[in-house]
A protein has these predicted regions:
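Cys-dependent protein tyrosine phosphatase-like superfamily
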Residues: 2-188, 201-251
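Ser/Thr-glycine-rich phosphate-binding loops at phosphate-binding pockets of nucleotides
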Residues: 193, 197-198
Length: 251
């Protein structure tokens, strides 16, 4: 069997698998705020189907002995792959505000899937906007040309994290004001992976609320596995459509 036939069979099999998965009933969404107190920590990572790294920031103890309220502050990754079940389940969170940190390039590449009509306010606070546009263009060009010489995605993200602190104070100040303006109603913020920009925003907010630094770091680091899982899914799709060599250079 030649390579074109193998690729055709692989794509057909993947399409059939996706179609079958669409009809498998999703498990009921476990919302921590609606569970007994002793079960909430175990379900901090909400079991959405197509929204990665969706977490409730409730339950963290502050330095003065209080706790962050469950069901008020949520963080997540992209909604581009949200399932129909996910869109239905979002309503159960009674969100007042959704804050999107993604760049215009990211939103063009993978638009959010949200309930229609959305029963919450969407606020765009793009961080790394022009930088991300350039990065997306570079990655796309490298994938198409199969050229990954001297391309280090980890170095790019380290540089981005430094920029959060040095260059994006107005954006994160706007984020804090948006949370305040929600007047105690549930707020969700997200970027693409729900890790760096979203994590930086969560860290700022938790420190303002008085959560000790050790717990803030613990929450930030909790994004590593969900982000890795999401990246692995992207690599699988690259293997299907671009081949092993291209996928290995990204992974």
């Amino acid at each position: 069997m030649n390579s074109k036939k193998v690729l055709g069979v692989t794509i057909t099999a993947a399409a059939l698998l996706i179609a079958v998965i669409q009809f498998i009933p999703a498990p009921a969404l476990q919302i921590p705020a609606q569970l007994p107190a002793e079960q909430r920590d175990a379900h901090r990572l909400l079991n959405f189907e197509g929204i990665s790294n969706f977490r409730d920031l409730g339950g963290y103890q502050t330095a003065d002995g209080r706790r962050v309220k469950w069901g008020q502050l949520y963080r997540a990754g992209s909604f581009a792959e949200a399932s129909r079940s996910d869109l239905d389940n979002l309503a159960a969170l009674n969100l007042a505000t959704l804050i999107d940190f993604r760049s215009s390039a990211e939103k063009e590449e993978e638009p959010n899937r949200l309930p229609e009509p959305a029963n919450f306010t969407v606020i765009d606070i793009p961080v790394l906007d022009e930088g991300n546009r350039n990065l997306f263009a570079e990655i796309s060009e490298r994938i198409e040309s199969d050229d990954f010489a001297e391309f280090d995605p980890n170095q790019i993200m380290e540089q981005a994290n430094r920029q959060f602190a040095d260059e994006f104070t107005p954006q994160f100040r706007q984020f804090i004001h948006a949370v305040e303006d929600a007047n105690g109603q549930p707020v969700l913020w997200h970027c693409t992976a729900g890790k760096d920009r979203t994590g930086f925003a969560a860290a700022i907010l938790l420190r303002i609320l008085g959560v000790p630094q050790a717990l803030v770091i613990q929450d930030y680091m909790a994004s590593r596995q969900p982000a890795l899982d999401a990246r692995n899914r992207q690599v699988v799709m690259l293997r299907l459509f671009k081949g092993e060599e291209t996928a290995d250079k990204i992974s």
